[in-house]
Amino acid sequence: MLFSKKRAATNTTQMKFVVKRFLDMYWRTPTYNLTRFFISLVLSLLFGTVFFGADYNSYQGLNSGVGMLFIGTLFNGMTSFSSVLPIASNDRAAFYRERASQTYNAFWYFFGSTIAEIPYIFASCFLYTAIFFPMVGFTGFTTFILFWVNLSLLGLMLTYMGQMFAYALPSEEVAHIIGILIISVFITFMGFSPPAEAIPSAYKWLYKITPLRFSLSILTALVFADCPELPTWNTTLKVYENIQSELGCQPLANSPVEIGHTTVKQFTEDVFGMVHADIWPNTIIVLGYIVLFRIFALLSLRFLNHQKK
């Protein structure tokens, strides 16, 4: 008997069934999604309470503000990475069975797992941003939207990275260990501690390829490096003139003597390397990492098989 097609169903039919299956699975797994929403709620209230009424115009206040974004970025990213590993690993068994019977193409599994994450990531990040953003004193509707979108892209990037490890490695435990080790290296080279300017030249290449540092740079530059026109320094009076209302335009108070006079924007860009002009290039790089992780996830689904014979 000869068959003209490898699979009985068309690609359109496969797509409909697999995408619906993933959407139903996510909807019927409240422990996964409610955990993300609960952590987003707790983190936003925690940071909002601690930094309520904070003054970011001082040297100590600005460093604390960047540290707040660093910790918030890290916690949101780690939540996305860790929580997706069990659900991705458990579904792999069904995928192996159905691939053996040629029920569905691996591409539609990849497509379904990609689509199912998007609404939940954007919704949980919106909850976080809606509470956190005004409570810590950040302003601006456009800045709010960009902050939410880029935080969501960070969540997608780490979620897809987790799926990639779950598909590529033999077990959930191995994926978790390897992922934590790699993310630990990323944390060191995100540009906050140590700051970008203090990273030794021999390790600059690690800083330049760390995915998390692009997201942190975007979020920090949005709120601390936004200044359309820097104020001018009056050398005679030793004061800044023509100071605009944006946070990035404000003079940095109580800065160390070796730093001298500077603004919030200049300090953020010079010390932490988080430049406002790089927001859009960095966003493209984050999207590039998302695509890269999805490609590796697809290749893992297609060519790797960790079943025990």
Locate each region found by the language model.
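Short, membrane-interfacial amphipathic segments enriched in basic
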Residues: 1-17, 204-211, 309
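Membrane-spanning alpha-helical segments of multipass transporters and channels
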Residues: 24-309
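Aromatic- and glycine-rich beta-strand/loop motifs that create alpha-glucan
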Residues: 4-38
